[in-house]
Amino acid sequence: AIIPKQFLKRIERTGFGQFLFYEWRFDEAGNINPEFEPNKPRYAGASVLISRANFGCGSSREHAPWAIMDYGFRCVIAPSFADIFYNNCFKNGILPIKLSEEQVEDLFQRTAKHDNYQLNVDLNEKTITDDYGLRIEFDLDEHRRQFLLQGLDDIGLTLQHESEILAYEQKRAAKQGA
């Protein structure tokens, strides 16, 4: 689980990073599991998470992207995502990138091969690069790209049209008052 159910009792967006992958990151005694890949020192501070297919399955609540974001990941790369989770990522400032299984496997291999391996995700250019010649272009709806580039959520998007909304409300109120 991205975040176990016992940690879903709050509605604040922050503080969930400590519970991310809790059942894998920690053993039964609450000690850090050194075998869990993201716990290894070489991944400290990583902002890109690489995963297998159907990432986010069973995580329809927004707590999952809140935990991912709070932990420090800004991008998740996988061959596929659960639909609700995928949409919730955009609503919470996380870039989910769909690549082929072969491309994702190549990223896993590169990560294992090179110490201090770093992926560079360029949202403007819609590319993923590394220092070893990798260049992958990814597809992303332009509306969603702009949404992320501008740091918007649904409310922020609506507020961009505040003057038009107010003008409409005034016009409608004037018609109803006549």
UniProtKB/Swiss-Prot annotation:
It comes from Paenibacillus polymyxa. Heterodimer of LeuC and LeuD. The gene is leuD. Keywords: Amino-acid biosynthesis, Branched-chain amino acid biosynthesis, Leucine biosynthesis, Lyase. Belongs to the LeuD family. LeuD type 1 subfamily. This is 3-isopropylmalate dehydratase small subunit. CDD domains: IPMI_Swivel (cd01577). InterPro entries: 3-IsopropMal_deHydase_ssu, Aconitase/3IPM_dehydase_swvl, AconitaseA/IPMdHydase_ssu_swvl, IPMI_Swivel, LeuD. It comes from the Bacteria. GO terms for biological process: L-leucine biosynthetic process. Its EC number is 4.2.1.33. Pfam families: Aconitase_C (PF00694). Pathway: Amino-acid biosynthesis; L-leucine biosynthesis; L-leucine from 3-methyl-2-oxobutanoate: step 2/4. Coiled coil: none annotated.
